[in-house]
Amino acid sequence: AMTNIDRKIMTLTARGIDCSKLSKYNNGEPFIDAKGNKVDDLAAVLYNYSGGYTINGPIFALNALDMGNYTIPENAVWTREKLLETILNHKYLSDGFGLDMVTMLMQSIAPYQNDPVYGERVKAKLWEGFDIVMDSFGTDPFDNPFGVQWGGVYTSEGASQIICALSAMGVDVHTDVRLNNGKDSVLTSFLNYADFDEGYFAHSNTTPKNAMATYQGCYATQWYLGFLNGGGAGHPYS
């Protein structure tokens, strides 16, 4: 699947590995994948992918290729232009993945806000997503005013993805008046899921010590810290 290649590149790139020349890490020899294929340039495997996909495939592909600033040739199956066009033309909430895919889509295109070709479309898409995020918050101010639900349950993963998306587009999830009611904010709502003594994030108020919630919570934290330290929009890897 396209997303499997995306994840491999993001994981390896995050560890400082150049996925366009894997033989550097194997005594000059390409690696052999599970199907017996020799793989030296994993980035090329991704941008020349020709199989089926759902929208998360192009979204994560753009993230993966941008993480390592990988060069994509003009004759690739998936150029950056094609990835951007596919993502920008995707209708929010039409994929069955809910709010999480809205915010993941926003994360992928946010670095292109000032692009001379795509910038205006990117900004419009981001603010459309922002409105969807705002509409998703709880309506009971005494319940969880900045929480988001999945299957009727407030989850930390949803909060994590919102923090990443809004930080990427340059919106402060703690101080922006639209995201802070004077008592709570998107950030404080997210931190309610953190167990600082045990060092984990809970999935929900009734599901503690969750692995997925913890790693998403950690990179959302890193994303917000990157936003603060970098003085505005952007990815933590930029």
Residue positions per predicted region:
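An alpha-helical repeat/solenoid feature that recognizes helix-turn-helix modules
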Residues: 1-21, 48-74, 89-125, 138-177, ...
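Alpha-helical repeat scaffolds
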Residues: 21-46, 73-88, 119, 123-130, ...
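HEAT/HEAT-like alpha-solenoid repeats
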Residues: 43-51, 84-92, 131-138, 188-195
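A residue-identity detector for tryptophan
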Residues: 47, 78, 127-130, 150, ...
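Intrinsically disordered, low-complexity repeat and linker tracts
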Residues: 231-238
